[in-house]
């Protein structure tokens, strides 16, 4: 089973922007009081879950989630920019509704000043290819964003990107995927 990685995906914890209906995009963002509590619960929930390593988006809200959840544990947390949320460009920091109205149009066409969902999926695919070829990683927890999960659904579960982008994002306590050597080699 060389190269097979169990991937556990968790979104960053609740932010002040989430609570206000703001699409943070590539802005840093910060956890709300409730979000800090949820991050602590994430650490408790996953601490004895055979996690070998944590990969985390380098955006502030994801980093804060990882620090609260896994700070003071022996788990190594590696930050990776490829796990970032979609760059909404001119709409970073705009109301969620304004971004949601544009989602389907932005599967292949970038947001003005930003990127497309296919662009974000391609960068996540590069990371998945690296994971699939690494014999040292077996069960990896990823802390990311909506676009990260949609990329996983597309690349690892074979769901059409247009469908996952158009579906509602229902939060839950993690999603699990399997990364195989050939699973992520198609970035679109």
Regions found by a protein language model. Name each.
Residues 2, 47-50, 131-138:
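Glycine-rich phosphate-binding loop signature in dinucleotide/nucleotide-binding domains
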Residues 3-73, 115-118:
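Active-site-proximal alpha-helix that buttresses catalytic centers in soluble enzyme cores
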Residues 7, 138-146:
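Generic beta-sheet signal
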Residues 40-47, 125-133:
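Generic structural signal for well-ordered alpha-helical scaffold segments
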Residues 56-57, 122, 143-144:
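Short beta-strand scaffold positions
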Residues 157-185:
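Domain-level recognition of soluble alpha/beta enzyme cores
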């Amino acid at each position: 089973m060389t190269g097979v990685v169990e991937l556990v995906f968790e979104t960053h914890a609740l932010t002040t922007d989430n609570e206000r209906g703001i699409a943070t995009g590539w802005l840093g963002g910060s956890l709300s009081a409730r979000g800090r509590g949820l991050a602590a619960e994430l650490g408790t929930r996953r601490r004895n879950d055979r996690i070998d390593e944590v990969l985390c988006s380098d955006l502030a809200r994801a980093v804060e989630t990882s620090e609260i959840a896994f700070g003071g544990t022996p788990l190594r947390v590696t930050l990776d920019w490829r796990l970032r949320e979609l760059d909404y460009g001119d709409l970073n920091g705009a109301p969620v509704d304004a971004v949601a109205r544009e989602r389907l149009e932005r599967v292949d066409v970038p947001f003005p000043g930003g990127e497309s969902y296919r662009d974000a999926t391609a960068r996540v695919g590069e990371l998945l290819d690296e994971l699939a070829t690494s014999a040292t990683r077996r069960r990896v927890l990823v802390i990311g964003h909506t676009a990260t999960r949609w990329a996983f659904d597309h690349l690892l579960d074979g769901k059409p990107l247009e469908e996952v982008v158009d579906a509602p994002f229902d939060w839950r306590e993690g999603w699990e995927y399997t990364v195989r050597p050939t699973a992520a080699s198609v970035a679109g």
